[in-house]
């Protein structure tokens, strides 16, 4: 029986649930010798909405600035959001804490995945998932997938080259796209990739000294090359097909990605 079923059967009040949660966090902190911070975004919102924004950075800053600890375990649950906000949050927590682990039991998609890849460790339950990396951009009054936007423009360009025309609706839409806007979308995607390529070697790979198979020393260039391969794989929309696709532990540990994940369900103290 799961904990939630147990709590329902016990008819726990909101206050009792809060006390139970604080007790579990305290127990977790002792087991891991860490400070657990819980961040949960608006999973119920559609992906195009941006629940992870600069407002979240200011909240995280206010809640963690006075914490006196070397280790931070950051529980994250979000469908995605702003890459710039992720950069600010990571810059702050990396400057404040010596060791950071990210804990994923629900969804940490898109920008949430980028943040998770800045950790020294990644802890996941079987129910947890990351997602394809795809920056979100604001076009007019809507926030949409940068990749989908670029693919749509590419599709319309190819259609125009092949047939010599576009239907009136598409022609009107394309006419409103400026070169600067299109360039900005390309830069947004590259920005997301750059963060992953910078953070993986610096943090997740910092103790990767010897290769597992050939047992040869790992150079900084090898770390950067591997980080770029992982970023490219997570941005490979031909493989994942959907922005909201769940990337599970088995996917992350597969040969094509090859990340080491700490499996919470295999740890009798944590599960």
Predicted regions and their residues:
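Terminal-region recognition feature
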Residues: 1-107, 113-114, 118-271
